[in-house]
């Protein structure tokens, strides 16, 4: 029987759009060959065996599902807008923005080579890799005559959002909207992070959200909305989506209200 690497076979069978996507699905344990999980992309498999992939995300990564919830729940329209994706990684947020009608997306990441191949070759995506968003200046991102982004989405790790907000403010033009993925484990002190890097205390989660919100308000951003991510982080952390804007008519929640929200969210996740 003929054999082939599983990652290339998935592409040949048009089950994946790129080898990179295939490798990601395989490593995530989402590919079954003859009803068995194969989690190594280089595994040689018989080409005639039945292959099944778990229900796949409509985006290049499941991060897109997180942003989709925010866009839907907050009723944010990105159609025809120039957007910025801070911490583009594989490109889930960017894919979501493009599918929602964004005109252009500037993707920024400290890493290199992680972006989905299809997005990398999409003329609507302008990549700025090996770049620290915290220190990025507008003149380093935009060419003369280019319209600056007016809407940003941010998903960063191993750095507090409070450190990148000043640069983000300068990179955006009016109406300066932003949706931030708040990851408590990167916002609170080490003493509040439990085993495997998980922040379980709702009050600590609320503190993370409140600190980011306060830092944003110091830059003249205003609160527009808060929701929980529909997906847990890789280690099991509950994550939140914070919507910022200017000239907001929505009352800003106080710390006690955010704690109550985090407690409700915690109860929902633990009861499932």
Where are these regions (language model features)?
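A short glycine-rich, Lys/Arg-flanked "PGG" loop and its adjoining helix->strand segment in the class I
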Residues: 162-179
């Amino acid at each position: 029987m003929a054999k082939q690497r599983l990652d290339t076979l998935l592409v040949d069978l048009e089950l994946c759009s790129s080898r990179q996507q295939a490798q990601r699905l395989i490593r995530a344990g989402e590919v079954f060959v003859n009803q068995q999980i194969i989690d190594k992309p280089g595994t040689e498999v018989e080409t005639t065996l039945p292959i099944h992939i778990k229900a796949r995300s409509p985006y290049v990564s499941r991060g897109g599902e997180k942003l989709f919830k925010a866009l839907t729940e907050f009723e944010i329209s990105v159609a025809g807008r120039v957007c910025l994706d801070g911490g583009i990684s594989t490109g889930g947020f960017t894919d979501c923005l493009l599918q929602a009608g964004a005109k252009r997306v500037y993707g920024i990441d400290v890493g290199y080579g992680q972006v989905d191949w299809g997005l990398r070759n999409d003329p609507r995506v302008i990549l700025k890799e090996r770049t620290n968003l915290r220190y990025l200046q507008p003149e380093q991102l935009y060419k003369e005559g280019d319209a600056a982004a007016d809407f940003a989405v941010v998903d960063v790790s191993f750095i507090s959002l409070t450190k990148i907000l000043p640069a983000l403010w300068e990179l955006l033009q009016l109406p300066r909207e932003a949706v931030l993925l708040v990851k408590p484990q990167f916002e609170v002190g080490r003493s509040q992070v439990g085993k495997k890097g998980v922040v379980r205390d709702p009050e600590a989660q609320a503190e993370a959200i409140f600190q980011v919100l306060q830092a944003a308000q110091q830059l003249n951003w205003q609160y527009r909305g808060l929701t929980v991510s529909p997906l847990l982080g890789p280690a099991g952390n509950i994550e939140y989506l914070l919507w910022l804007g200017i000239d907001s008519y929505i009352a800003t929640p106080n710390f006690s209200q955010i704690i109550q929200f985090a407690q409700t969210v915690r109860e929902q996740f633990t009861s499932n």
